[in-house]
Amino acid sequence: MKEKDITQKVLEDNNDIFADIVNVLLFDGESEVEENELVNTTVHSQYKAEDGKVHEQERDIAKYWKRGGTDIVLYGIENQTKVEKRMPARISGYEGASYRGQCDKKTIVPVITMVLYYGTDRKWTAPKNLKSLIKVPDNLDKYVNDTKANVFEIAWLTDEQIAKFTSDYKIVANFFVNKRKNKD
């Protein structure tokens, strides 16, 4: 695990920061998610690869948004400092494991993964949906699920977007915007 990744995870795992990120990036700054409504959940899951070996995958952060004791959404955050060309496939694995983990519950809630891209040299250039990574015969296209990568380019946020942050994440976002603008 990279040191910078640990620092990002520790910061974003704070409920006030996590709620602020969700509120600004998904709800345009509206206070939909309160920090006391977020509950950590497991970030580890396993899968058996085609080689027959069992592998573990680890999300960066995963939290349930609960209101009145009821699960509303499971949010996941993935931090990226470099463009990951197979990100939609990775997200499909994370989200599939999250849905599978809910199968024994009374209700299944949506899983939303947010990719926070911290690159400052270039914008995200990789595919943002699964079908862009794979060749699907036309006659099968309607049967293939198309996982989407919700990529947020932090270094390219506007001043208006950054102004909507109310937590210390505003400092982080400003840092990456300034780093991109002032390469020196």
What are the roles of these predicted feature ranges?
Residues M1-D184:
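Conserved single-residue anchors adjacent to enzymatic active/cofactor-binding motifs
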